[in-house]
Amino acid sequence: MKDALQCPSLFKAYEKHFRIGAAVNSFMAFDPAYRALIRRHYNSLTADNQMKPESVLDYAATLAKSDLLHAAVDFTRVDALMYFARDNGIAMRYHTLAWHNQTPRWFFAKNWSTAEDAEPASKETMLARLENYILDVMTHVNEKFPGLVYTWDVVNEAIEPELKAPGLYRAWSPWFKTCGEDFLFAAFRAARKGQAPGQTLCYNDYNAFEPVKRDAIIDLLKKLQTENLVDTMGMQGHYVMDWMNVPLCEEAARAYAALGLKIQVTELDIHCNSDDEAHSRKLAQLYGDYFAMLKKLKEEGIDIEAVTFWGVTDQDSWLTGFRKETSYPLLFDRAKQAKDAYDAVMKAAK
């Protein structure tokens, strides 16, 4: 293994093909070792949590406003990462504007109530709150950091086939329970209003390669396209080494591209529960095959804009907590050393 800071740059290896990004947090932005690694290898950044609604919505300030349609926002965490990206010449993906998760319960409640049994706000109220929130965020970012954000994740994870609800939507989501499908259109309409030149609007989801979910996502994208509301499909890419299927990923990417959409891989990692030699070789093979596939599609004319890893090193991966076992899913290990998977990704670029 080699020190990541002594290795050739990932993003420079792929700069003729697509951006290479990473999900980062505020700690990384202020830690010298992480800062150096990020500057060397990535030309796109995504906030892992700092730009989700729960990190931006300000409850006390919302109550003080006495406006039941307009929540207050606090951009302290957003701005910290935006400054880091701007000062280092790195483009940003904004993740995410509308999501059922990591959005405070009071945002969906009548009178901004925090009570466990709070009455839900009406559909009309929620659609107004959604539009106001999206426009507040986009206006702030685009005015304070012009040209920095190139893509907005407008809606995140609206499809869940296992629920078998109409449209295979995530029916238990407070957005769907209150607003139904209309929330999707409202979110993208608001984002179109707030969009700056050169920015794209993205629908983002996991397991987007799985055929049943893929087809449901395509149905949703086609509906959004009737109003020209979506530009990009975000294929998250949270894979597990034992069942990752690169041909299915390719098939899905081709299907989304056939709609005329740009493609981004937005949250790439491959769960691997051992760092022994056999697992390391298998992880490297999968990463190499995956990037070779993406490069091939790009060379065929499919508009793959960016590939973003969900984390920088194995140390900061969310998967160890989520999977409840140590995960080794990324290209750099806990000591910031390049793994075999890094070598495979670099080889695929040639």
Put a short name on every predicted segment.
Residues 1-44, 48-50:
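Boundary/entry segment of secreted carbohydrate-active catalytic domains
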Residues 3-10, 57, 126, 140-147, ...:
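Aromatic-rich peripheral "rim/lid" segments of glycoside hydrolase catalytic domains that contact
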Residues 6-15, 82-86, 188-196, 225, ...:
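Surface-exposed amphipathic alpha-helices with a cationic face
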Residues 20, 92, 201, 263, ...:
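Hydrophobic/aromatic residues located in beta-strands of well-ordered beta-sheets
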Residues 23-33, 54-57, 69-76, 159-163, ...:
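Acidic-and-aromatic substrate-binding clefts and catalytic sites of carbohydrate-active enzymes
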Residues 26-39, 131-140, 211-224, 287-294:
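Short, acidic/polar
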Residues 40, 44-61, 67-202, 206-208, ...:
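Substrate-binding cleft and catalytic face of glycoside hydrolase catalytic domains
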Residues 42-49, 150, 156, 199-205, ...:
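Aromatic- and acid-rich polysaccharide-binding/catalytic face
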